[in-house]
């Protein structure tokens, strides 16, 4: 039996320079097997402080672990596909709040908006207008943690 492989969709907050207990209103939605390790990776490339504010567990229950692992990646492809799909669903839910890199650069008073790699790809969101608490409530209501293959079968049969 393969040991459970936990994967998560996470939300990371960018912190204010002047008061690192306050969020700037910009958040990154991504996926990782270890959100705390991913936070540390992101922090090394970001001058502002970052804080993990929410995770959504997307792993399967202990009875669904018989799927073979990919020998090259040593990952369970069923889980990776699911986690990637869940991340995409959550990101699409908030597409109207997605930040273009130059919007974040301007907000942070960086003049060279052509250097779009400074703040990474399109996984950053501007939630200043709706607030992170509402975002988390919407995610938790719409995307409960994955319960395994049985949940997928039931949703296909009855919906």
List the predicted regions and their residue ranges.
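Non-catalytic accessory segments flanking enzymatic or RNA/DNA-binding domains
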Residues: 1-159
């Amino acid at each position: 039996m393969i040991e459970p492989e936990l994967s998560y969709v996470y939300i990371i907050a960018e912190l204010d320079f002047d008061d690192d207990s306050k969020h700037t209103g910009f958040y990154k939605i991504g996926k990782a097997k270890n959100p705390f390790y991913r936070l540390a990776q992101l922090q090394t490339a970001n001058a502002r402080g970052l804080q993990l504010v929410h995770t959504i567990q997307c792993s399967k229950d202990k009875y669904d672990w018989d799927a073979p692992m990919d020998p090259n990646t040593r990952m369970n492809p069923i889980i990776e596909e699911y986690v990637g799909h869940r991340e995409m669903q959550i990101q699409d839910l908030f597409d109207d709040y997605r930040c273009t890199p130059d919007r974040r650069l301007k907000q942070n008073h960086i003049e060279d908006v052509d250097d779009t790699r400074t703040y990474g790809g399109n996984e950053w969101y501007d939630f200043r207008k709706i607030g992170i608490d509402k975002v988390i409530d919407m995610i938790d209501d719409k995307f409960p943690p994955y319960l395994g293959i049985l949940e997928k079968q039931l949703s296909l049969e009855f919906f």
